[in-house]
Amino acid sequence: MNWNFQNTYTELPDVYYSDTKPYDFENPRLILFNSDLANKLNLNVNSNEKEICDFLLGKKNKEKKFFSQAYAGHQFGNFTILGDGRALLLGEHVYKNNRFDIQLKGSGQTPYSRNGDGKAALGPMIREYLVSEAMHHLHVSSTRALAVISTGEKIIREKFEPGAILVRVAKSHIRVGTFQFGSLLKNKNYFNNLIDYTISRLHPEI
């Protein structure tokens, strides 16, 4: 398996992201793997389970720059700066002139985690995997799920639950909240940088 990674998002001012390292889980195990999506991304899956897990968790790309994105929005009725509190971007996989964000959800703490552990439970990650694939096959644009990986940990929620990571794929993780965050910066150049980048990446025909 090989990524064809680029990181054009980090060409934006660094207020829009923070460098993040994934937690090094000792006993990851592949629970679900979307071979159809992997083939569409030209990942050439001919590896054993451990190699697939190491590959998907970024262990084969330790020299690369991983990061979490900043954004803002409403939470519990209040407008606040949020950011990826339990997700990071491994990079942008490029295939046939198409660019896909590869994101790990539940990979550990980030600079935006606040008091959270940055991790995720297995049940919700399986549920998101199933729902995102259902949305895709119903022709509703959304993220897609490449894999669910058990971390081998027990994490504390209402009770102890098995931990997991969801590997998500999307054309971009830029969202409304990214622009809400940009507007808070009171820096016209930074905001225009974001607008120009988004148009160039997602709507070059404009």
Predicted regions and their residues:
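Broad phosphate/nucleotide-binding scaffolds in NTP-utilizing and phosphate-metabolizing enzymes
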Residues: 1-126, 130-175
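ATP-dependent phospho-/nucleotidyl transfer catalytic cores
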Residues: 155-206
